[in-house]
Regions:
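N-terminal membrane topogenesis motif
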Residues: 1-32, 88, 92, 234-254
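Interfacial/gating helices of multi-pass transporter permease domains
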Residues: 38-60, 192, 196-197, 241-245, ...
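Small-residue-rich midsections of specific transmembrane alpha-helices
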Residues: 55-77, 141, 291
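Transmembrane-helix boundary and interhelical linker motifs in polytopic inner-membrane proteins
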Residues: 67-97, 155-160
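Alpha-helical transmembrane segments of multi-pass membrane transport and lipid-handling proteins
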Residues: 95-119
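Alpha-helical transmembrane segments of multi-pass membrane proteins
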Residues: 110, 114, 122, 126-148
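Membrane-interface junctions at transmembrane-helix termini in multi-pass inner-membrane proteins
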Residues: 143-165
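Hydrophobic alpha-helical transmembrane segments
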Residues: 165-178, 188-220
């Protein structure tokens, strides 16, 4: 028992170290990439940053409601089943949730894509914001199912794949952003809207890389086959309903800050046009500074 406890503690420490490294690298990349990105955007930098921020505000809220706190619940359930020596229940659970979250991702991705013109109009920007939000819909499509796999590894107390997937996501995202922006602004058409659209589409490219890393670790550790081959039966429908009920308070509290940011976005340009003579372009630039 003592050896098992020591092993679990060591595994937890390693996992904490991996997550710390992942968070540090992600924040470092976030602080560094903006410098060349801003320079390459040239005179359009402030407006490009404003459009980027507006797209991401809505995108972040869609990510929040599309996952609905379920990955954390998955981690708790997997940890519970493993403690009870019922690992097959864990694999059956993941298979059920993967199907459910894939469907959820599809629904919310379609909503974001189809309602982008309406959301862009509410933001006061118009058609410039539409392709940016539509490019982010692709990331919404796969994020829910990817987050389930992350929750599975968290429940297995194996945080290395979780952290490695985060690192891969951020590294590939930043590489795509910078390469696309450089080629468009410095060697191509110079269309800053296309550069911003590719910069937001980079979220999807990064998630694909993250998904590949997670699948690799599942296969390497012999877990992928067990997820799809297990015949263990669980009451997944009831578990889904119970999980969503538990997640509702987290959705409400977690989305509060995001909703305030969206409210600012939806009212800033419209209210400023009522009381000032600034152009729409000037107001987008101001929004980028204030946000």
């Amino acid at each position: 028992m003592s050896n098992e406890n020591n092993h679990q503690q060591a595994q937890m420490l390693r996992g904490t170290a991996w997550l710390t490294a992942s968070n540090f690298i992600s924040r470092l990349l976030g602080a560094i990439y903006i410098i060349p990105w801003y320079i390459w955007m040239g005179t359009y930098a402030a407006k490009a940053n404003g459009l980027f921020t507006m797209g991401y505000n809505i995108y972040a809220w869609f990510l929040l409601i599309s996952t609905a706190g379920i990955p954390v619940a998955v981690a708790k359930q997997v940890a519970k089943y493993n403690t009870m020596r019922e690992e097959e229940h864990s694999f059956a659970l993941i298979r059920s949730f993967l199907g459910f979250m894939t469907g959820l991702g599809l629904v919310f991705a379609l909503v974001l894509y189809l309602f982008s013109p309406w959301l862009a109009d509410l933001s006061g920007v118009g058609k410039d914001l539409i392709p940016i939000m539509q490019s982010l819909a692709w990331a919404v499509l796969i994020f829910p199912s990817m987050s389930v796999i992350r929750g599975f590894f968290q429940g297995m107390n194996n945080l290395k794949p979780y952290a490695m997937s985060q690192i891969a996501e951020q590294v590939i995202r930043v590489i795509w952003m910078l390469l696309a922006t450089f080629f468009i602004m410095k060697m191509g058409s110079g269309d800053y809207l296309s550069a911003v659209t590719q910069s937001t589409f980079a979220a999807f490219v990064g998630m694909v890389a993250s998904f590949v890393v997670l699948i690799y670790f599942l296969a390497q550790e012999g877990l992928l086959k067990r997820v799809f081959e297990t015949r263990d039966k669980i009451n997944s429908k009831r578990l889904l309903v119970d999980t969503i009920k538990e997640a509702i308070p987290f959705i409400l509290t977690g989305s509060a800050i995001q909703l305030f940011q969206i409210l600012d976005q939806m009212t800033f340009i419209r209210s400023m046009t009522w009381f000032t003579n600034y152009s729409n372009e000037d107001l987008v630039v101001m929004f980028s500074y204030f946000s």
